[in-house]
């Protein structure tokens, strides 16, 4: 594109006159351009250098930078035949990126039409196609679009031959437009050439094809010029008011492009109100009033309101409630991502940043706010280049640049503290997390904004619930951010609920879709009579749906008018959002759930036979937690279940998970025999840095983070290494544990159950006196004696600080023969269910059941021998018969024991045996 400018017959005199003006290049480049401009004759023609002199001239001119403008202009210095003329680089240094884009689009339009030149008409198409500049906006407001303009251009000049050179030259009129655009910029007091100046130059030239195109499209050139001047004036006023500092009125394109004026937004009322944070805002004001190193850096956890402090300062400045040191200043937030974006060539980023710093220094009324200030480090750095932090350091130290930074504690430590030279230039301002009471006040200040957005109302109870519930249940985020998110999502939920179609309308919509589908099929099948009937039905349904929607809107409108500003968000909505986020039930207990909780022991006893003490203790803990009476800073409950093997310690935890938490999989189970060695203990919280598995997290901490409301079972706790007990002290007391990455995991909504076989030998010795021959009082006294002995054993095995943190130590009883018989019924039912899947009906006789209990009863081993007896006597016999094809799908089978004690399997479809079996007992 730039080579096309070489075709100029003379250097514009206005450009040649720029020899004495400021030139944005190195000293060497300035001298080269001055030399070339001075070498012109009175007609301002310049003969190209040849040979070695030409190469040197090229090198001298091109080696000045890598900006977009210089890239375009550099192409003009390549060797050309004698008599060739070009536009000097100084003109392109003044082009904005939008103006460069216009010229490039003009070339594309020339190629599209097959023309080997760029005239005024192509520049006009480029101005329209650019789309975002002042020129494009004015032309669009006049009703001129790219499609119509292309048609008019093609009507006037037609299409070219199709052969287009790589370098398309500019026509003399197009060069005249460029010259006039520079003059227009000077007259407006601008030190740059934008798309608006190109349009003004185009209108001023007034004799090219572009003028005819505008005339044909019905646009008045004088009206266009007036609109451009007006928009340029408004832009200047806006920039002067928001960036330039009022009196100077100078335009600051770099700051305007990469920054957002918070003070202007505050004046327009577009910022959320800032409640509290007075000490932090005053400290920031004090630091900004210093002579040097006047750069505060807001440091705090994510979501505590660091950006809000900068917005609060902008609001104070807008209201005039600040000391004279910063009165009238503008807070501009800098978008670092936008500043870096698109810098493809070396030097572009540095040039943008230097321009931005120059504009801030010239204004002397700008306070720069950089959110995520740690992104300065490394921004724009490439091989051999320096990053943004090092470019800004001198200005930050001397007080030439007032900058407010904001970053998190981790990022500050990771990036800024590693660079002491940068750290000393920023003065840290700690931003603590607000308390629950402060958060409630913040929510009250924001309430009006969210009510307007969601078109509903919040009560004070909603705001209190949002602050308290978010503090209690959402542990991995910080106030006030998580509380604000709660009321925001609750408002969205209520609004969507009220905006839904009534059920009747949904049914009609479903029917309408089906009828439309049938109508289309009828049309395709050329059954037009049926299609006509369906069309009539379709129109009828549409009318009904429209009537229902209108009626629903009227009802909603009436409700809104009755409630002043719309639906009401309730505390239950806030609770529902917390539950959906965390999985923790915080809603009020419903009638059905209340009945379930009251009958919890009865339900658990359908699976757990005996062990009343343990079942009652767990049920009490769940009820206490569900109604909100538990200590909010400790787990729901922590138990240690001790007793002989096979009496239901682990089974009770599984039954609780299945009944109350949904399934056995909802339980987090850790077999402590896997943590017997010292080096395996770290698996609970994650490997330390430098070890394999560091990034994966701990088995315990990660499981609880994903499912904070659950049962955690530490099976066979006495098998664990003693270091595990040290780790569990803070879980049992404070309900928290820090993993290997320093993240705090919340155990306040978990039920901790530890099982142990410590004391089983004592129970076995004393168990001989527990049986059918003892009455109730003797059983209780024997159990109490054994319980005290087991407790002593536990005290000898575990350290006192560990046992002292447990809520209860529950000793399980040995199973009696009657209890084993009930357990046998439960186990047999499980076998029946497995066979029912295979369509085999199984029944057992009373004799068989007694045989199973006799073989499976062992007071020392609990119910596990019973499981082995059922497997040997029933499952093995059934498996042999099924493999021998004696039992098939659909058969009814009775299992009995003959007079010799052998198990017999009787198939109901194979006839009656000679010795009839007794009546089967349903289990």
Curated annotation (Swiss-Prot):
It is found in: Plastid, Chloroplast. Residues 569-760 are annotated as: II. Residues 92-234 form the Clp R domain. Keywords: ATP-binding, Chaperone, Chloroplast, Nucleotide-binding, Plastid, Repeat, Transit peptide. One of its GO terms (molecular function) is ATP hydrolysis activity. PROSITE patterns: CLP_R, CLPAB_1, CLPAB_2, UVR. Pfam families: AAA, AAA_2, AAA_lid_9, Clp_N, ClpB_D2-small. Residues 255-502 are annotated as: I. Residues 95-160 are annotated as: Repeat 1. Residues 509-544 form the UVR domain. It comes from the Eukaryota. SUPFAM superfamilies: Double Clp-N motif, P-loop containing nucleoside triphosphate hydrolases. The keyword Transit peptide applies. GO terms for cellular component: chloroplast. Gene3D superfamilies: 1.10.8.60, Clp, N-terminal domain, P-loop containing nucleotide triphosphate hydrolases, UVR domain. The keyword Metal-binding does not apply. Belongs to the ClpA/ClpB family. PANTHER family: ATP-DEPENDENT CLP PROTEASE (PTHR11638), CHAPERONE PROTEIN CLPC1, CHLOROPLASTIC-LIKE (PTHR11638:SF155). May interact with a ClpP-like protease involved in degradation of denatured proteins in the chloroplast. This is ATP-dependent Clp protease ATP-binding subunit ClpA homolog CD4B, chloroplastic. The lineage of its organism: Eukaryota, Viridiplantae, Streptophyta, Embryophyta, Tracheophyta. The gene is CD4B.
């Amino acid at each position: 594109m730039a080579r096309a400018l070489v075709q100029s017959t003379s250097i514009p005199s206005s450009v040649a006159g720029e020899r004495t003006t400021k030139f944005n290049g190195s000293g060497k480049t300035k001298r080269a351009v001055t030399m070339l401009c001075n070498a012109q004759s009175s007609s301002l023609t310049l003969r190209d250098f040849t040979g070695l002199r030409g190469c040197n001239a090229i090198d001298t001119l091109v080696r000045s930078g890598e900006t977009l403008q210089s890239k375009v202009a550099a192409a003009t210095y390549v060797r050309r035949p004698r008599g060739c003329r070009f536009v000097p680089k100084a003109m392109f240094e003044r082009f904005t990126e939008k103006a460069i884009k216009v010229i490039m689009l003009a070339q594309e339009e020339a190629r599209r039409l097959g023309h080997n030149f760029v005239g005024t008409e192509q520049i006009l198409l480029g101005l329209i196609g650019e789309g975002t500049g002042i020129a494009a906006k004015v032309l669009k407001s006049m009703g001129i679009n790219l499609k119509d303009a292309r048609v008019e251009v093609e009507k006037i000049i037609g299409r070219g031959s199709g052969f287009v050179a790589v370098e398309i030259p500019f026509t003399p009129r197009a060069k005249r437009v460029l010259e006039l655009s520079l003059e227009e910029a000077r007259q407006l007091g601008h030190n740059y050439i934008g798309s608006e100046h190109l349009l003004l130059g185009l209108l001023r030239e007034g004799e090219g094809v572009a003028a005819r195109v505008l005339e044909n499209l019905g646009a008045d050139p004088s009206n266009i010029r007036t609109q451009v001047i007006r928009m340029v004036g408004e832009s200047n006023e806006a920039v002067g008011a928001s960036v330039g500092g009022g009196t100077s009125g100078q335009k600051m394109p770099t700051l305007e492009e990469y920054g957002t004026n918070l003070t202007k937004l505050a004046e327009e009322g577009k910022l959320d109100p800032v409640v509290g944070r007075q000490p932090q805002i005053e400290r920031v004001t004090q630091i900004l009033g210093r002579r040097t190193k006047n750069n505060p850096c807001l440091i705090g956890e994510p979501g505590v309101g660091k950006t809000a402090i900068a917005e609060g300062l902008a609001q104070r400045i807008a209201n005039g409630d600040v000391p004279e040191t910063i009165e009238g200043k503008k807070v501009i937030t800098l978008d670092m991502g936008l500043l870096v974006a698109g810098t493809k060539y070396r030097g572009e980023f540095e040039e943008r940043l230097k321009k931005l710093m120059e504009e801030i220094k010239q204004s002397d009324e700008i306070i720069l706010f950089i959110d995520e200030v740690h992104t300065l480090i490394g921004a724009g750095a490439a091989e051999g280049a320096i990053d943004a932090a090092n470019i800004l350091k001198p200005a930050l130290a001397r007080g030439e640049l007032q900058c407010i930074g904001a970053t998190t504690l981790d990022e500050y430590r990771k990036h800024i503290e590693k660079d002491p030279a940068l750290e000393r230039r920023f003065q840290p301002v700690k931003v603590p997390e607000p308390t629950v009471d402060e958060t409630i006040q913040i929510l009250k200040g924001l309430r009006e904004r969210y009510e307007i957005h969601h078109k509903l109302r919040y009560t004070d109870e909603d705001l209190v619930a949002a602050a308290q519930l978010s503090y209690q249940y959402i542990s991995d985020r910080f106030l006030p951010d998580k509380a604000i998110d709660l009321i925001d999502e609750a408002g969205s939920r209520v609004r969507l609920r009220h905006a839904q179609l009534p059920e009747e309308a949904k049914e009609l919509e479903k029917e309408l879709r089906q009828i439309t589908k049938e109508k289309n099929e009828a049309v395709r099948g050329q059954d037009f009579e049926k299609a006509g009937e369906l069309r009539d039905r379709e129109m009828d349904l549409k009318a009904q749906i429209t009537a229902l929607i209108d009626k629903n809107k009227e009802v909603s409108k009436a409700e809104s008018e009755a409630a002043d500003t719309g639906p009401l968000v309730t505390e239950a909505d806030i609770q529902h959002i917390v539950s959906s986020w965390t999985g923790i039930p915080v809603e009020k207990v419903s009638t059905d759930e209340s009945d379930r909780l009251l009958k919890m022991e009865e339900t658990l006893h359908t699976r757990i036979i005996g062990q009343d003490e343990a079942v009652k203790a767990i049920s009490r803990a769940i009820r206490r937690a569900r109604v909100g009476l538990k200590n909010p800073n400790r787990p729901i409950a922590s138990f240690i279940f001790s007793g002989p093997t096979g009496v239901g310690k682990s089974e009770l935890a599984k039954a609780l998970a299945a009944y109350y938490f949904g399934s056995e999989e909802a339980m987090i189970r850790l077999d402590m025999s896997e943590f017997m060695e010292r080096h395996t203990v770290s698996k609970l919280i994650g490997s330390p840095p430098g070890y394999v598995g560091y990034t994966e997290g701990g088995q315990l901490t990660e499981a609880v983070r994903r499912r904070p409301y659950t049962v955690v079972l530490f099976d066979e706790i006495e098998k664990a290494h003693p270091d595990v007990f040290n780790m569990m002290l803070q879980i049992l007391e404070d309900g928290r544990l820090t993993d290997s990455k320093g993240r705090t995991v919340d155990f306040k909504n978990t039920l901790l159950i530890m099982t142990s076989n410590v004391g089983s030998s004592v129970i076995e010795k004393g168990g001989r006196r527990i049986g059918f021959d003892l009455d109730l009082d003797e059983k209780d006294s024997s159990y109490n004696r054994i319980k005290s002995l087991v407790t002593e054993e536990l005290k000898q095995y575990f350290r006192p600080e560990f046992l002292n943190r447990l809520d209860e130590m529950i000793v399980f009883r040995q199973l009696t023969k009657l209890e084993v018989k009930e357990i046998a019924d439960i186990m047999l039912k499980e076998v029946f269910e497995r066979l029912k899947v295979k369509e085999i009906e199984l029944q057992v006789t009373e004799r068989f059941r007694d045989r199973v209990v006799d073989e499976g009863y062992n007071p020392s081993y609990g119910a596990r021998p019973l499981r082995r007896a059922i497997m040997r006597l029933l499952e093995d016999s059934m498996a042999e018969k099924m493999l021998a094809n004696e039992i098939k799908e659909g058969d009814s089978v009775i299992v009995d024991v003959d007079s010799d004690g052998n198990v017999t399997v009787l198939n109901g479809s194979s006839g009656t045996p000679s010795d009839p079996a007794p009546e089967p007992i349903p289990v």
